[in-house]
């Protein structure tokens, strides 16, 4: 079964309708459990799906100019990952301690005065022709026809916290 959002896959596992799902990283799982009062647990990492910065109207990060726009996912943990990747590449600086809960409100320095365009994760790739750059989750990058190794201008390293996980409800263990 394919879902087009991040909520329903966890709801069907929590309800017992499905035994497991496979799409998320630990920060999202933890946030989901806290916000929804669910009892899902990580059953182990499967593979690495890095976030990447991909070309929009610009083909290189060397072309970054004052006022450029960058589209990012707007859900809490994925927006934070996108912002951390932008910070790792010298585009913005976040407040100390912002971490995996960072939002645009945590941007402390913006030397290029970039406009951060916040969109639902599944919409980000669709604005590539309208924004200077896009920052995509690995799954949406693949779905949009991007290759991390061939198309990403920058991407998360394998020691990032962003591994995809299989989850199970606690009552099935």
What do the predicted segments below correspond to?
Residues 6-37, 59, 141-145:
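Pocket-flanking alpha-helical
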Residues 164-170:
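Conserved small/polar residues in nucleotide/adenosyl-binding loops
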Residues 14-24, 68, 112-115, 129-136:
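Alpha-to-beta junction loops
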Residues 43-92:
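A conserved helix-loop-strand patch within extracytoplasmic ligand-binding domains
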Residues 31-43, 58, 130, 135, ...:
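Ligand-binding "clamshell"
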Residues 8, 12, 17, 27, ...:
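Extracytoplasmic/secreted proteins, especially bacterial periplasmic and envelope-associated proteins
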Residues 25-27, 48, 56-59, 75, ...:
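Solvent-exposed coil/turn segments that connect beta secondary-structure elements
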Residues 2-11, 99-126:
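Short helix-initiation/N-cap motifs at beta->coil->alpha
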